[in-house]
Amino acid sequence: MNLMATLLTNTMLTSLMVLIAFWLPQTYTYSEKTSPYECGFDPMGSARLPFSMKFFLVAITFLLFDLEIALLLPLPWAIQANNTNLTLLMSFMLIILLAIGLAYEWLQKGLEWTK
C-alpha cells in the first residue's frame, strides 16, 4: 500500500508540474534563444564545409583518455575492499599506461591540430 501511495504521489506531482509548465507564458522569446546552436557553425548553411582532420583526431584522443580516466572513478570505493594492494597496483598500472599513451601522442605530435 505504501508503494502505491508513493507512486500515486509521484505521478500526481509530475503531472502537476507538466501542466504548470504548459500554462506558464513563454516570456523573453528572442530569436537567439529559439534558434539552434551548433558549436559556432551556422546550422542553416551548407553541410559540405571543410573539416579539420587533425581536430577530429584530437577530439577522439580526448574521448579515449576521458573514458580511461573514468575507469579510475570507483577507486575510492575499491580501496575499502579487503585486497587493497592489488587494487592500488592495478590503478597505478592504469595511470602509468595513460601516461605512456599521452607521451606517445605528444611525441607523435598528435595533440596539435593547427599545423
Swiss-Prot record:
<dbReference type="GO" id="GO:0005743">
    <property type="term" value="C:mitochondrial inner membrane"/>
</dbReference>
<feature type="transmembrane region" description="Helical">
    <location>
        <begin position="3"/>
        <end position="23"/>
    </location>
</feature>
<dbReference type="Pfam" id="PF00507">
    <property type="entry name" value="Oxidored_q4"/>
</dbReference>
<dbReference type="InterPro" id="IPR000440">
    <property type="entry name" value="NADH_UbQ/plastoQ_OxRdtase_su3"/>
</dbReference>
<dbReference type="InterPro" id="IPR038430">
    <property type="entry name" value="NDAH_ubi_oxred_su3_sf"/>
</dbReference>
<dbReference type="GO" id="GO:0006120">
    <property type="term" value="P:mitochondrial electron transport, NADH to ubiquinone"/>
</dbReference>
<comment type="subunit">
    <text>Core subunit of respiratory chain NADH dehydrogenase (Complex I) which is composed of 45 different subunits. Interacts with TMEM186. Interacts with TMEM242.</text>
</comment>
<comment type="function">
    <text>Core subunit of the mitochondrial membrane respiratory chain NADH dehydrogenase (Complex I) which catalyzes electron transfer from NADH through the respiratory chain, using ubiquinone as an electron acceptor. Essential for the catalytic activity of complex I.</text>
</comment>
<keyword id="KW-0812">Transmembrane</keyword>
<keyword id="KW-0830">Ubiquinone</keyword>
<keyword id="KW-1133">Transmembrane helix</keyword>
<keyword id="KW-0249">Electron transport</keyword>
<dbReference type="GO" id="GO:0030964">
    <property type="term" value="C:NADH dehydrogenase complex"/>
</dbReference>
<keyword id="KW-0952">Extinct organism protein</keyword>
<keyword id="KW-0999">Mitochondrion inner membrane</keyword>
<keyword id="KW-0472">Membrane</keyword>
<feature type="transmembrane region" description="Helical">
    <location>
        <begin position="55"/>
        <end position="75"/>
    </location>
</feature>
<protein>
    <recommendedName>
        <fullName>NADH-ubiquinone oxidoreductase chain 3</fullName>
        <ecNumber>7.1.1.2</ecNumber>
    </recommendedName>
</protein>
<keyword id="KW-0679">Respiratory chain</keyword>
<dbReference type="GO" id="GO:0008137">
    <property type="term" value="F:NADH dehydrogenase (ubiquinone) activity"/>
</dbReference>
<keyword id="KW-0496">Mitochondrion</keyword>
<comment type="similarity">
    <text>Belongs to the complex I subunit 3 family.</text>
</comment>
<feature type="transmembrane region" description="Helical">
    <location>
        <begin position="86"/>
        <end position="106"/>
    </location>
</feature>
<keyword id="KW-0520">NAD</keyword>
<keyword id="KW-1278">Translocase</keyword>
<keyword id="KW-0813">Transport</keyword>
